[in-house]
Curated annotation (Swiss-Prot):
Encoding gene (name): ssb
GO cellular component, as recorded: nucleoid
HAMAP family, alphabetized: SSB
Alphabetized GO MF terms: single-stranded DNA binding
Entry's transmembrane regions: none
InterPro entries according to UniProt: NA-bd_OB-fold, Primosome_PriB/ssb, ssDNA-bd
Keywords from the UniProt entry: DNA damage, DNA recombination, DNA repair, DNA replication, DNA-binding
Free-text function comment from the UniProt entry: Plays an important role in DNA replication, recombination and repair. Binds to ssDNA and to an array of partner proteins to recruit them to their sites of action during DNA metabolism.
Protein name: Single-stranded DNA-binding protein
Motif Important for interaction with partner proteins mapped to chain: 157-162
UniProt source species: Wolinella succinogenes (strain ATCC 29543 / DSM 1740 / CCUG 13145 / JCM 31913 / LMG 7466 / NCTC 11488 / FDC 602W) (Vibrio succinogenes)
Annotated Polar residues bias: 85-101, 122-143
Length: 162
């Protein structure tokens, strides 16, 4: 199966950064994407889609440092279903995107010390404790991508609304 999402849009709110008990950073952002289309009567239609996105590790910290409400970004990631029980005991769920890479697209950043078009992939999303960087290591080597630990969703087919 293939699960890949690519979104270009603007942040709907400032980055919400917190740290997990493991020490890894988690940033929650919201993105608004627009789709323009031609209606049957010939006029232009505009459809806005709001998407919640989770960023992990160094990517989350970079997003918190450089992004703010209104920033234009490109996200590559995967679609996930989050499930929880609310305060009244109701089972709730929603779709969100777990980002695997982030590109900042604002052109104004280029003139202010710049981050335009930089790609911050979260291949290092799991923290490395006690690791030291060596000047003798081979250039352009990257650590392999490690999937963040996401708990398995326990849901019956009868609970799915469609």
């Amino acid at each position: 199966m293939y699960n890949k999402v690519i979104l270009v849009g603007n942040l709907t709110r400032d980055v919400e950064l917190r740290y997990l008990p493991s020490g890894s950073a988690l940033a929650k952002i919201g993105i608004a994407t627009n789709r323009r289309f031609k209606k049957q009567d010939g006029s232009q239609g505009d459809e806005v889609c709001f998407v919640d996105v989770n960023l992990f590790g160094r990517t989350a910290e970079i997003a918190n440092q450089y992004l703010k409400k209104g920033s234009k970004i490109l996200i590559e990631g995967r679609l996930v279903l989050e499930s929880w029980t609310d305060q009244s005991g109701q089972k709730r769920s929603k779709h969100s995107v777990t980002a695997e890479s982030l590109q900042m697209l604002d052109s104004k950043g280029a003139s202010q010390g710049g981050y335009e078009g930089e790609d911050y992939s979260s291949y290092d999303s799991t923290p490395s404790y006690g690791a030291t960087s060596s000047a003798k290591s081979a250039p352009n080597t990257q650590a392999p991508y490690k999937e963040p630990q996401i708990p398995e969703i326990n849901i019956d087919d009868d609970e799915i609304p469609f």
